[in-house]
Every structure is written in C-alpha cells, then in structure tokens.
Amino acid sequence: MVRRVALVSIVLALLAVAPSAVGKRGITETDLFTFVWVADPQMSPDGSRIAFVRVTVNEKADQYESSLWIANADGSEPPRQLTSGIRDTSPRWSPDGLRLAFARSIDKDGKAQPPQIYVMPMAGGEARAITEMARRASGPEWSPDGKTIAFAATAKPEDLAPKSGDKPRESDVRVITEAEYRANGISGSGFVDRDRPSQVWTIALPAAGEPPAPPTRVTSGEFPASSHRWSRDGSQIYFVADRRRESYYYPNDSDIFTVSKDGGEVKTLVSIDGSIIAYAPSPDGKRIAFVGIPAGKPERSYSQPDLWVADIPGGTPRNLTADYDFDINGSIGGDQRSPRGASPAGPIWSADGRSLFIKVGRHGDADLAAFDAQSGKELSGAGADPHHEVISYSADQAVQRVAAVISTPTAIGDLYVIDGMVGASPRKLTAFNDELFGQLAMTGPEEIWYTSFDGRKIQGWIQKPPSFTASQKYPLILEIHGGPHTAYGHTFTHEFQWMAAKGYVVLYTNPRGSSNYGQEFGNIIQFTYPGDDYKDLMAGVDEVLKKGYIDESRMGVTGGSGGGLLTNWVVTQTTRFKAAVSQRDISDWANFWYTADFTLFTPTWFHKAPFEDAAEFARRSPITYVDRIQTPLMFILGDEDYRTPPAAGGEDLFRALKYLKRPTVMVRFPAENHELSRSGKPWHRVERLQHIVGWFDKYLMGKPTATYP
C-alpha cells in the first residue's frame, strides 16, 4: 500500500510539471558561457539586409568576442558571418549600400590595440583600415555623398605625428581641479583624462589602391563631443555637448551643436533647459527631432524623457509629449543586454516627415510607437506581442521596415524585422540561443498588480520554479532594482531564471521611484529615498504570501546599486528576511557624497551638503542603524566601482557588522566596476551568481558550505 501511494505521488508530481519542462533541465549559471548576444542592428538603405554585431564568450580566455554578421530581411537565408575579428563593432552602411564601415580592435604582441575604423566592400573583398589613430577611434558615420566618414577619437593632432629621438619623461602626478575626476568604466584608477576629451574627426575615403589621407579633427577644445551626425546636405556635422565648465554646479544641460564639415566655429543648433540624449534630422533637413530631459524647476531627481521637435536653425523647441506620461526612449533593466557593441537608439522620421517612431517604456514593456511630428499625438503603439523589450533598432531609407533586437523573459535578445514599422508582429531572423534554450525548462513570470500602504498601485512579477506546484512551500527571494529610476519588466534576466531553477520563487517589483510609470510616480521619492519605496516592497512580499505557497521562514532579499541601498535599508527595518545579499551598494550617504564619480552638488537627492545637514544624511543611511541588523548579510563589490564606491557601501557595513559579531561576508571582484552583473568578465559574472545563490542556499535551503563558515 505504501508503494502504491508513493507511485501515485510520483505520477501526480510528474503531471504537475509543465509539459514544456518534461525531459529538460534547469538553466545553470555556467550556461552564460554559451549565450549569444545580438546588438546594434543596422538596416541596409534598401531594406533588404541587416548588419549586426554577434557577441559570444571565449570561456578559456575569459573574454567576449564580437564579429559582424548579416541577415536577409526576408529571412530567405540563414544569417552569415561577415568579419573574422574578435572585437568588431558599430557596423554602418554607406548611403548606396555597397560598403560597410565598422570599428575593429586587433591584437598586437598579445595586447588589444586601440580600435580603428575599417571599411569593407559588400560585393566581396577584405576589410581595410582607414584610420591609424594613437587612441580609440569609434562611431563611424557616413557623409550623405558616401565620400567621407566622421568618427570620434580622443587623440590630439600631435599624437599622429611620428616621434623621433628619446621620449621625454612624462610625470605621472595628477593635478586635479574639478570635483568630478573619476568615471566608472575607466579601467584601473578611473581617472578622467581631461587633456584628451572625445572630439569629432573626419577622413576622406581613399580611392582603390591609394593610402588613406590624414584625418582631420573637426571639433576641439576642452569639452567632449558625442553623438555626431551629418546634416542632410552634408555641409555640417552635428554633435551633443555640455560646454559649461564645472557643469556639476548646475542642473544637467546638454545641447546640439553644429560645425562645418571642415571645422571652424561651433554654433548652437538646438538648446533646451535640460539634457539632449538622442536626435535625428528630418528628411528635408529643416527640422530636428530629439529626446530631451527637461531640467525642471525646482530641480528633480527624476525627469521623464520626452520627444521634442525644433525647426533648424534657430527654431524654438517644442515638447511633443509633455502630456504623455510614459518614458520616451525608455528601457527595462536586466542582466543580458549585449556586453559589447550596444548602441543607443533614438527617433526615426517617416519618409514624408509627418511621423516619428521611437521606443516607449511603459508598465514593464519597451516597444516602438509612432507619434505625429506636429501634434505629438500617439498614432500607434505596441504590436501583437507587447510583453517584450525592444533594445535597439534602425530603419531602411524609405522607413518601411525596421530591424530590432527584442528580448522577452524567456529569450535573450534576437534579431527581428517589423514590416510597416509598428503594429505588425515582429519576424524572428536569428535563433542563436534556440538550441540551448530548447534544452532548458523555463517559464515566464506571473504579472501582478497590488495595492501599497497608501492605495498606490504597484506592478510586479513572480518568477516560479519550472516544476512549480502550488501545494508546496517555496523559499522566496525579493529582488530590488537599482537606479532608483529604472524598471523591471519583460526582458530576460539570467539571475532570476537561475534562482527559479534552483527552487526559489523570485519576486521583483517596480516600487515608487521607478521609471516608466509617469513623472509623479518617478519623482515622488526625491528627498525621501529610502523610505516609502521600502513599504511598497514589503506590500509586494505580503501580496505573494497571501498565495499560500511561500515558506515565510525562508525569505531572502537582494539588489544592486540603488537596490543594494534598499537591501541594506530592508535589513535595518525588519528581521523577516533570513539572508540578504547587498550588491554595489550604498550604506553611508555622506561617504557617497564625497567619493562617487558624480556629484550631488545640485539638490536632486538632498537639499544640502552633508557637512551642512549631517542629521538628514545620517537619517537616510543604513549604517546609522547597523545595530539593528540581525540578517546574515553578504556584500558583492567591484574593486573598480567608482559609481557606488565600496568605501561608501559594503566596506563600511562589513566592518561594522564584524565589530558587532554578526554573520557577514564580503566578496570582492578585482578589476570590476559597477557593470559587473551586465558586462563583467564572464567568469566573474558566473562566480557572482554562485556566491549570491550560495549564500541563500546556506540560510534558506540549509545547505552547508565551507566557503561561508
């Protein structure tokens, strides 16, 4: 009888498993080594082909490798490899579609060399380097006549001159005069080289068999230039810059400037009271559309991006979406964007100049939408499957077809094509991860909306194990996003899927302060962070507990950056969580004010400086309440994180907790910065996941480990 009951139990358990999970395994942390990413899709002018970046992992070398691939837009043939380099990025079609420019870094004497600009004939033949810059060259952009390429470089003209004789000694002593002198992502010490800001250069395309002519620097001076583009008639080059000295004393403000293709006087093309982050001239060259973030009066910690249009030159910018309460150019937070080769996306004009197409972030989705270029009215929105994230995109010259990288909660971004721009169902062109993912038991998350303490509606998702059975009790992990003005949603996150595969239910939500829910929702936490967002998170946990399948005695919490701050805050306010992992965190706001790579000189988070209002900085700092922490707490820190420096976060709390003899451990990742989880070295990303889940396994699953005695 006992055997019969056991057999019935086994059969029932098998029936409870989702059909798609039968015969499949759970995803693992080391599956990252076989992931393939697609980035920077570039539609050919005639809409027939798409060039894109394909990124893979070289596990042995512990590095990413990127090459250029091409796909037919009609899907008639499988995508094929175009280039054989391992650091090829930024493909850009010539106006006639006969050539492709791109950036490539080669190895010399075992070391990666500064990237140079290459040009490849699409009818066949080898790619040819057209630059030989002493420092990084990037961002190739073709002139309308196809005879010249503009690019960005940090070199000076004197760097190009041949050196003779002994090299004079250069001092390694730094004289620093500005408050912002380091930047996250600069390897090593993180110090910014202000003697060599990024400038715009041009180079004429050489005739066949001829050597390239020397490049020409078009912009100069102390201010970096970014996002360069040609005017429609090819006479000017536009770029974005903040040309104010020590601009950290003022609200964020960048404008679009213009300069002759031959260099000379720089003139302001478009200016707003705020920042401009992406733009596109109209087909007739008489207008320019851009994504602008108004500075706001009084200053705000969160300003919703809007779509603007201005007549050029000299026209007054008009905010088309001032009353549209979603994020223009919005995105979704995850850990599986391409670690290399990504490119920003912006507005695209319709061929007749009457409409604008751009990505919109709203309620966990990021999808293309169309707007009237005069009134700003939304003309069309999400297509047949809105539960996804459009990561990057481009269109053909006639603006009848768009190439896009699209991700879902169960699929890393693949290349798709959308005929008719928006509203149509995307057609999938690549399937690089399908073989692997076909072996994996994965499920999509359950979307929930719940009511917080003050009646505000909060959106969240529950990721369950592949073999989930409602009658069982599961440990819960609460995930908290950073920013804090970012958002979770319908995109692939390896971390969540692996936790679920390990038997955890994962809850992730967008508490107040998140982007993609409107201006008021985003900015409501400005001078109270952390605060009521904590209550939103706890309300989410309570909502999941009502479902009956969570073991309340086995709950953990983790988050990174702003999510690390909130993780620290959570464990100072409650003991309901039995383990916590705080990543790239903040524990002491005063230390952060002094050491982060950006300043808080303007009143976006605090009204005053810490030496002017020490009590307020202490009130909102988790370190102030360290004696309350009973939860075993792990810290995940990158040694080169200058965004949330360890000295302002985990180092402080770790030392304090050791003093108090509370269970804690600090895990340090050498040569890693704030982007460890998204673009850190492959093995470090895997080890990060192993440590996070290992800590939860110890305290929530009761699995002993020698790593954390």
Features from the language model and the residues they span:
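Beta-strand-rich domains and repeat architectures in extracellular enzymes and scaffolds
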Residues: T30-S66
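Active-site-proximal cap/loop segments of hydrolase catalytic domains
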Residues: E495, A501, Y508-P709
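Bacterial N-terminal signal peptides
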Residues: A6-A16
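Conserved beta-propeller blade repeats
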Residues: F35-I50, G85-A103, E126-A127, E132-A152, ...
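Cap/lid segment of the alpha/beta-hydrolase catalytic domain
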Residues: R244-R245, F326, G423-A424, T430-S553, ...
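Short glycine/acidic-enriched loop and turn motifs that connect beta-strands
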Residues: T56-K60, I106-G110, K156-D159, R244-S247, ...
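Predominantly five- to eight-bladed beta-propeller fold
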Residues: Y64-S66, T154-P211, V240-R243, Y250-D255, ...
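Short loop/turn segments that connect beta-strands within beta-propeller blades
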Residues: N72-S76, P121-G125, L205-G209, S260-G264, ...
